[in-house]
Amino acid sequence: MGLPKSAYKKLLIDCPTRVINKNCAQRVKDVSPLITNFEKWSDKRKKLYFKDEEEMVGQFHLENFNLKNNLYGRLLASPMRAEKISKLKSCRELLIPLKVVPSTGKDQHADKDKLKLVPTLDYSKSYKSSYVLNSASIVQDNLAAATSWFPISVLQTSTPKSLEVDSSTFITEYNANLHAFIKARLSVIPNVGPSSINRVLLICDKRKTPPIEIQVVSHGKGLPITQSVFNLGYLHEPTLEAIVSKDAVTKGIYLDADNDKDLIKHLYSTLLFHSVN
């Protein structure tokens, strides 16, 4: 015999509250290492977000290294990007950005079916991009595999025949773009002299001196400060040498590291590009 409908109703609907687990609605505590040790197993560092970094430094009496005013601190603080040659991540400002553009044939018309990878000076969101190490010698040694430098999204949707990298002009094109930018900026930028505390001195010394050097000099009332010295004689570029050496009094050009950030960044990239690894 089956149970009457009233019995079903009593069992399913009118169940006494004393048999219900009151803690069933509570969330089970996360104990899985996939959650508790996410940063460890995923190889990702835990990120800390602050609305006001300066307020945090003052509130908790933390040491302030003033990296905002440090040339090299700004370079190292740039976003991390995966690099195509070493397959490692590095600061974006220490890499060569590459952009994907339509390939142009002999008739100077773009071929929609072919894509070309070219070096550029600055990252742009309007192009699909990737990055390689900012070193002429390393790039030269790996140009044979340059088609693998295309972004992954392009490699997955294109055939090898449709991808092009001009290895004969790749290095010279990037070098020419850097020099053209630097020449244009140096020809109009004022020489701030040794008055600026946060400064970079450009010199032209063809002797065996390092391309980049940090010196401790006296400023004002004899207070010691550090200044970066960029030796453009390392580039063997007559036009740049003439611009830097035109001031016989200062024997170089002083740049303000706060106001001339873009120029200093490209000067650093140029010296880094030509440095011997």
Swiss-Prot record:
Pfam families: RRG8. GO terms for cellular component: mitochondrion. It comes from the Eukaryota. Keywords: Mitochondrion. One of its GO terms (biological process) is mitochondrial genome maintenance. It is found in: Mitochondrion. Required for respiratory activity and maintenance and expression of the mitochondrial genome. Belongs to the RRG8 family. This is Required for respiratory growth protein 8, mitochondrial. It comes from Saccharomyces cerevisiae (strain YJM789) (Baker's yeast).
